[in-house]
Amino acid sequence: MTDFGITGYGAYVPRLRIDRALIAEAHKWMAPGLKGQAKGSRAFTSWDEDAITMAVEAARDALTGADVNGLKAIYLASTTLPYADLQNSAIVAGAILAPTNISSSDVGNSQRAGTSGLLQALKAGEPSLFIASDAPVGKPASAQEVAYGAGAAAFTLGAENVIAKLVGMASVTDTFVDHFRATGEKYEYFWEERWVRDEGYAKLAPAAIKAALANANLGIESISHFVMPSLLRGAADAVAKVVKFTGAIAPGLENGVGYAGAAQAAL
């Protein structure tokens, strides 16, 4: 694993933007509280875009100057893949002219697919392409309609010209439900934000961070950058405070992109 890691990266964000103030204005008669969240704009997909097309664009960006024929596997993580019983990653593989003997895998069913899928690819230890692409849809007049965006990010993985490698990891699995979307449903059900923040992020995230640091044999003072995707503004800052992190916190991309679901961490 010491000689294997990320060798290249790419991204794609749809060109279209919607001003959040317009969303709040349209729903003010039934959800006046949205006005306080109506800052900036967010990305959204055009009529001919979806998780697959965005994945292809991000993959092509990541593969600039690279040999696609050297890939052994392709992974596609998303919660909004267009096909339920047809391998979406295989379509991406065809679009980027990958060799036909490549292994392809779809990773989904959770907005954590972006990180869990990347860990799977890193553990496999073979030349591969990992893509996270998502365009979650919020229920009309909900906070999610205001916050959700769209985008994709891709990483090439290999053992040559490594620019970032995995030095430690940890996972915490708990049946904590902050939101869910049942099979066949278009929109999600969300629990109250204070519950998610205080009982979820504030307790589970620090436990995972401390375990990852221990696995890497590092102290928090050795870390210079902290990336934590969250639909709740300020969640990353709150968790950083709990674990006594004083370095740079990656911006949440709220303005211009929005929260891109499974692709958020990679973006």
Q: What are these regions, as identified by a protein language model?
A:
Residues D3, V56, R60-L63, G158-A260, ...:
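Hydrophobic pocket-lining "lid/loop/helix" segments that shape and contact the acyl-thioester
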Residues A11-V13, L81, R233:
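Structural signature of outer-membrane beta-barrel domains
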Residues M1-D3, N69-K72, P99-I102, A124-S128, ...:
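Short coil/turn connectors at secondary-structure junctions
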Residues K72-T80, F226-V227:
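Short glycine-rich or small-residue beta-strand-to-loop segments that form or flank ligand, phosphate
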Residues M1-D48, S142-E199, K203, K210:
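Condensing-enzyme catalytic core mediating Claisen C-C bond formation in acyl metabolism
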Residues I6-G8, A62, I74-Y75, V92, ...:
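Buried hydrophobic positions in well-ordered alpha/beta secondary-structure cores of metabolic enzymes
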Residues K39, S46-T64:
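Active-site-flanking structural segment that lines cofactor/substrate pockets
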Residues P32-G36, S41-E49, T79-L129, S133, ...:
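Conserved catalytic cysteine-centered active-site region
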